Amino acid sequence: MKPVMPHAQLDWDDQGRPRSRVFDDVYFSDQSGLDETRYVFLEQNRLAERFAALSAGGRLVIGETGFGTGLNFLCAWQLFEQHAVAGARLHFVSVEKFPLSPADLQRALALWPDLKRFSDQLLKHYVAIHQGFQRIVLDNGRITLTLLIGDALEQLPQLDGQIDAWFLDGFAPAKNPEMWTAELFAELARLAAPGSTISTFTSTGWVRRLLNAAGFKMKRTPGIGHKWEILRGEFLGWPEGVAPPAAAKPWFARPTRLTGDRRALVIGAGLAGCATAASLAARGWQVSLLERHDAVAQEASGNPQGVLYLKLSAHGTALSQLIVSGFGYTRRVLETLQRGTDWDDCGVLQLAFNEKERERQAQLASAFPEDLLQWLDQPEAQARAGVGLAHGGLYYPEGGWVHPPALCQAQSAQPGVTLLPHQEAVELRKVGDQWQAFDGERLIATAPVVVLAGAAEIKRFAQSGELPLKRIRGQITRLAQTAQSQALATVVCAEGYVAPARWGEHTLGASFDFSSDDLTPTTAEHLGNLAMLEEISTDLVARLHVSERDAESLQGRAAFRCTSPDYLPMVGPLADREAFTRIYAALSKDARQVPDMPCPWLDGLYVNSGHGSRGLITAPLSGELLAAWLDNEPLPLPRSVAEACHPNRFALRRLIRGK
């Protein structure tokens, strides 16, 4: 049976207020939802004074069960703006099984004109909200909202972070008992920071007792409106006699957070480097972005058009989860760029060009909801594309194309990022607590933190030389549009892809060459790209007058993709390879034992590389992931996915498997 995106099913009363059909309960008080939110959640957690106490560079993390209409989040944001100093940040993490559709959210939030300035920003970025972790960055990075879409007991155990204040705001315990269980409260305790506070609108005795048993000290306090009493409390610590949650494996544990000088060098100004620089700068870091060329996006990130295409698995793999979360994040980032020139959400159609592909697509169509992907038969696909097609396929309505240099330029132009062109680092040395980057014997930059984001070129550094990255040459072809080719309405993919024209040119590609190191475009690969276009649409070939074009004069460009053996990127802190092998040598004899030894981190050295042909999907969110590792923030991905992307995974496999 085709899954349906579990959007909230709502009824609306005569005053325009939403009510859940599933739980037969209201989203907020019939009297004054704003007053109740401010009293129950903001006042009981003492947020006004805690926001005021934050220093520049400080942050407070709020966790919530039940995002609903976002009312609590918006009220917290409004209060934060009123009391927090410039440079302080608010991070809000909320789990929601049944998210409102964008239209319903807009309708619900229209009830609160007092919050319009904040709700307008949320609504602008409330796009591509799909299952799993979905990060939304607001107010130029001052506000971070991480939505965990799905069942709370599936999503919260994957969250890695520390929560300073909890809002318990699911539907009433009698209506939705699954949100008020000992198992869930144990997750709240696991995630609670020392001294974390908690509040909820209910005063039910068994809820209070379960929270107390989880390590919170709860007490009843006078309520508001028709609520006679409510609960508030604080986290005292993991209860005695209960086994504490297992710590992260040392090779995946968080490095000690660096204090003091918040300067970073990012080496490489492609998609990964620019995303990393932007994410760090949003957190108050001063970032020097080193680039060997004269501008950003001059290598693999320099193609005129790249495709926002989700190559998914029906089996919920780490890569598939990363792609869904990364796709959503990239789509939201693109909302700040110019549609039509920098990007376009024209949709992406993946043709079922053979039986194997058709079977794969059938599995995906049964595993994912229609707002993410939908099966179109041949007539429907042809109508959607605007050109003749021989096959149906999967349509991704939120997909499209992106001009990668525009994204890189926007991210590198963020306050706090300084681009240093014509600077090619070839060696790193650690002196005291500073990393030094050299281009030979000349020192070009120093900082306590370095992020290697130069694709496979990072193998030139001794500290990262054994990372198993490989280069794959790819070439794209540019074709001037014709009056007839303007009919192409969406990106169409088979073995290759073709995009609707940008600035009068279609982009098609891309070749895969595993052996060549020469980046000079070749006629043979242009002809190969034209052959892939023929497989996509003979009608489009005719519309583009391909037979009349001189193959020798075709224009395009070639670059190297950078990929890893498991096709996941490498994002996170780097360890000393020799020390790692020595400390964890016992794993080669028994992989089940975990030596009680801290990982030998190369303090301050990180990597963001290996994005392959998925950089538009994975690199922007990987910038957030890297910044979260560095600043000890809640991770923007499930812990298991972050570990699957960790650079240490390869050293670990070599120890365990002997290869």
From Swiss-Prot:
EC numbers on record: 2.1.1.61, 1.5.-.-
Lineage summary: Bacteria, Pseudomonadati, Pseudomonadota, Gammaproteobacteria, Pseudomonadales
GO terms of biological process kind: methylation; tRNA wobble uridine modification
Purpose of the protein: Catalyzes the last two steps in the biosynthesis of 5-methylaminomethyl-2-thiouridine (mnm(5)s(2)U) at the wobble position (U34) in tRNA. Catalyzes the FAD-dependent demodification of cmnm(5)s(2)U34 to nm(5)s(2)U34, followed by the transfer of a methyl group from S-adenosyl-L-methionine to nm(5)s(2)U34, to form mnm(5)s(2)U34.
UniProt-listed InterPro entries: FAD-dep_OxRdtase (IPR006076), FAD/NAD-bd_sf (IPR036188), MnmC-like_methylTransf (IPR008471), SAM-dependent_MTases_sf (IPR029063), tRNA_MAMT_biosynth_bifunc_MnmC (IPR023032), tRNA_MNMC2 (IPR047785), tRNA_S-uridine_synth_MnmC_C (IPR017610)
Species assigned in the record: Pseudomonas fluorescens (strain Pf0-1)
Listed SUPFAM superfamilies: FAD/NAD(P)-binding domain, S-adenosyl-L-methionine-dependent methyltransferases
Keywords, comma-separated and alphabetical: Cytoplasm, FAD, Flavoprotein, Methyltransferase, Multifunctional enzyme, Oxidoreductase, S-adenosyl-L-methionine, Transferase, tRNA processing
An example Gene Ontology molecular-function term: oxidoreductase activity, acting on the CH-NH group of donors
HAMAP family per the UniProt record, alphabetical: MnmC
Catalytic activity reported: 5-aminomethyl-2-thiouridine(34) in tRNA + S-adenosyl-L-methionine = 5-methylaminomethyl-2-thiouridine(34) in tRNA + S-adenosyl-L-homocysteine + H(+)
Annotated family: In the N-terminal section; belongs to the methyltransferase superfamily. tRNA (mnm(5)s(2)U34)-methyltransferase family.
Compartment(s) where it occurs, according to its Swiss-Prot or TrEMBL record: Cytoplasm
Pfam families named among the record's database cross-references: DAO, Methyltransf_30
One cellular-component annotation, GO: cytoplasm
Region (tRNA (mnm(5)s(2)U34)-methyltransferase): 1-236
The name this protein goes by in its record: tRNA 5-methylaminomethyl-2-thiouridine biosynthesis bifunctional protein MnmC
Cofactors (names): FAD
Domain of life: Bacteria
Region (FAD-dependent cmnm(5)s(2)U34 oxidoreductase): 267-659
